[in-house]
Amino acid sequence: MSRIFRSDDVSVGERVVARRDFDGVYSDVIGHVLSLDPLLIRPQEVGGYPSSLDAVEIPPEQLKIIKRLSPRTVRNSDIRAIEVATAAAFPGKEHTWTSDGQWLMRAGDGVTGRSNSAIPLGPSAGFLPVPMEEIEAFYARHELPVCLAIPERIGASAEKLLAAEPEAWELEPEILVMVRDLAELPAPGDVSFRIDEQPDSEWLDLYHFRGQALPPLALEYLRSRIDGTMGFGRLLAPTGETIAITRGTLTESGDGTVWLGYSAVEVAEGWRRKGLGTALGAHMLAWGKAQGAEKAYLQVVAGNTAGVRLYEMLGFLEQHRHRYARRLPQVP
């Protein structure tokens, strides 16, 4: 099991994997938690759905480790598809593949991980050694620190690299990647909505990245052209004032599926806790579907419980997680 993902506490009702130790012989139970004390887990149906099977009780002395899982079974190809669509939405100023075709290296503003990291998108990336010499040379040329984007499972080789040199890396918080299909959507509501091909100064003035204003160059990269469609959405007060914003992208995954991704969600101070985040999300989902998107994804820091609840209300479920690892300066 991964050492860098899913260390959060589990709760009743959640889907988990529990490893049992029978005198050195290990066995995993995957299912839904019925009780924590005693630990009772009902094995899952195919696909990760709840079942009616008999529950399994795991005594404390047998429990080796327990980890929370995403609500449904996820294939590695599902994870890769979303990360490919995301990479197309955040290409950076320059991007190129390593010579083995397994890692996409991106350099941009030096601020956001999505545009300034190397990510394992090739089908064999999880099984081959990380091509660190190429990655280090790429970021040295751009005068940026080495940063690896590590999606769980398909980033297994990067996890091994970090485990071998834990003191050489700084790990950022876990990020949830949440998804939903666009077949049936919530009603957008009657708040005035507008979407533009490019943001104006009012949109840019409202946007912050993790609570901080972005430098001018980073804002320029945010609106740079991508291999897909981009839209800058906003909600308007009756006076015409911009009161909430978001950036939407339509990009393809490797299998040709069109994905709506939306990010840069911000609600103006004084307008928060009025349901505008939900209304903005509903409008963006409707816009994405009208533009031909079949599914939607977004990313939220795992510790942002309010954000996670908001997106669950919009029909999103956690699919997988990823983290960024930054190489620390080497001491001579």
Feature roles, as predicted:
Residues 1-8, 12, 62-83, 119, ...:
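Short amphipathic alpha-helix that is part of the acyltransferase structural core
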Residues 1-100, 104-111:
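Conserved RNA-binding domains used in RNP assembly and mRNA/RNA metabolism
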Residues 119-126, 265-272, 301:
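A short, internal acetyl-CoA/4′-phosphopantetheine-binding micro-motif in the GNAT/acyltransferase core
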Residues 142-151, 288-299:
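Conserved GNAT acetyl-CoA-binding A-motif
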Residues 220-270:
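A conserved beta-strand-loop-helix scaffold within acyl/acetyltransferase catalytic domains
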Residues 128-137, 263-267, 273-290, 295, ...:
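Conserved acetyl-CoA-binding loop-helix of GNAT-fold acetyltransferases
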Residues 149-156, 298-308, 324-331:
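Conserved beta-strand-loop-alpha-helix junction that forms the acyl-donor binding cleft
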Residues 83-92, 128-215, 325-326:
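Acyl-donor-binding surface of acyltransferase catalytic domains
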